[in-house]
């Protein structure tokens, strides 16, 4: 895992027990999962809008900024649910070299 993801995962874990007024992440944890999920949704929309703007303008700076926000809040969500970023990287590794059609066909039917 990248050093950045490792450091971020450590910070997110450390903030779980912190006072809500000590950091933004601690305040999100204190507000609960619904607030965290709301932020993930908000950042998803902002990322989509930034992608549309980048396609028109050719300037990807807002896209990169909003994608970083989306990834960050997704990592907060994972941490709040007791998951580590490595689990996502492991899943991506598992899929590497696997056709998207084959992966989809192998999913359990619901």
From Swiss-Prot:
Molecular-function GO term, any one? phosphoribosyl-ATP diphosphatase activity
Q: What is its EC number?
A: 3.6.1.31
Q: Where in the cell is it found?
A: Cytoplasm
What's its catalytic activity? 1-(5-phospho-beta-D-ribosyl)-ATP + H2O = 1-(5-phospho-beta-D-ribosyl)-5'-AMP + diphosphate + H(+)
GO biological-process terms attached to the record:
L-histidine biosynthetic process
Cite the NCBIfam families for this sequence: histidine_hisI, PRK00400.1-3
Q: Which family does it belong to?
A: Belongs to the PRA-PH family.
Protein name per the record: Phosphoribosyl-ATP pyrophosphatase
Q: Which organism is it from?
A: Stutzerimonas stutzeri (strain A1501) (Pseudomonas stutzeri)
Taxonomic lineage is: Bacteria, Pseudomonadati, Pseudomonadota, Gammaproteobacteria, Pseudomonadales
């Amino acid at each position: 895992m990248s050093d950045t993801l490792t450091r971020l995962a450590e910070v997110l874990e450390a903030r779980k027990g912190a006072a809500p007024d000590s950091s933004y992440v601690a305040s999100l944890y204190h507000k609960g999962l619904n607030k965290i999920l709301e932020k993930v949704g908000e950042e998803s929309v902002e990322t989509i809008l930034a992608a549309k703007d980048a396609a028109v303008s050719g300037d990807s700076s807002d896209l990169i900024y909003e994608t970083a926000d989306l990834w960050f809040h997704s990592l907060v969500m994972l941490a709040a649910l007791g998951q580590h970023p490595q689990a996502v990287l492991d899943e991506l590794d598992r899929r590497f070299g696997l056709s998207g059609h084959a992966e989809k066909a192998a999913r359990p039917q619901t």
